[in-house]
Amino acid sequence: ELLSQRIFLHFGAVDHFATVYINGQKCGTHKGGYVSFKVDVSPYVREGENIITVHAVDDIRDRLVARGKQAETYYSEQCVYTRTTGIWQTVWLEFVPKTYIEKVKYYPDIQSGMLTIVAETKGRGEFFAESFFDGRETGSARVFSEGGTTVASIPLKEKHLWRVGEGGLYTLYLHYGEDKVKSYFGLRNIRLDGYRFLINETSVFQRLVLDQGFYPDGIYTAPNDKALLADIERSMAMGFNGARLHEKIFEERFLYYCDQKGYIVWGEFPNWGLDLSYPDCIYGILPEWIEEIERDFNHPALIGWCPFNETWDTGRRKQFDEALSLVYQTTKAIDSTRPCIDTSGLFHVRTDIFDVHDYTQNPEALAENYRDLPKD
């Protein structure tokens, strides 16, 4: 019965170039060591035992391979740490019927109290969506689709805003043919108003930690869900309301807990290792960056994008500004709902927020550096 369905083999992340084989037959490849991908293995599996082989290559000396905070040397040094190669996130199988939901995007509107769902569907069928809050039904929508892009809008009977430090999530059930999905969304928007960062029209001061996502035992891999949640809870207990997810694309389980807790985060890319003085550096970031935006679009806790960190001119070689501008423009084209910082801290090219990295350790001196800034 299972073999009559479409079978997808999912990988949370494999660093860096992955080739997947089923029973000795090549069935898929993926480039990029940080984002999730799936392979349709339906034609390759057989009844009974199957052998899955993954060949991973991770040459971080290649100027087009993004390594983030992974050390180029055998040992950790300065602000780079132990390397990771191969499978470092969860692997699982998904069985789907012939008519199914491939992916969805949620567009909540806090003014109208409306949720618009844009789904990519396979096959013809009826698309039905139903939302709940604290167990109470809060709205539904039903449309027929020929497949492809399917749009449905739910007028919400109750308006519960997602809040920083609190969360507040709606449960969402999606049906398409025989396919059933349980999901969630948060009712929130983001807007810049001069020097103010507004979440649901309330100015929010971001007191963030720099989370680099390394663990003593698993290096890049968290030992369990408790470890992911503990990082968030410890940070909040110390008075922080969020984090820069620094030089690493975090696994979605972490973002799930951020959504629950109301813990705001910035999504980054592990751009260290890319040589930005060459025009072809774009090939080392753009495909995987687009995959990251598409994957994490629905997380309300994710409040902004930052594809590059601390880029600058090196020696006689100037950073290729057009690459930074292109990545910024691509980001805004895919996701106009969030701000984007082109390169955090240094040589900005085109950005929504002009941020500065100041490593002054003396509080009085730090305050003096910015005493002329407008106060809100």
Model features per residue range: what roles?
Residues 39-43, 153-166:
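Signal that preferentially marks extracellular ectodomain short beta-strand elements
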Residues 27-28, 138, 204:
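Short hydrophobic beta-strand segments in globular cytosolic domains
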Residues 95-124:
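Surface beta-strand/loop "capping" patches
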Residues 22, 113-144, 150-154, 172:
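Beta-strand-rich binding/interaction modules
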Residues 230-233, 242-376:
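Substrate-binding/catalytic cleft of secreted carbohydrate-active enzymes
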Residues 51-54, 166-177:
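Short, aromatic- and glycine-rich surface loops/edge beta-strands on solvent-exposed regions
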Residues 1-100, 123-126, 249-252, 261-266, ...:
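Accessory beta-strand-rich segments of carbohydrate-active enzymes
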Residues 104-106, 172-235, 341:
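N-terminal carbohydrate-binding accessory modules
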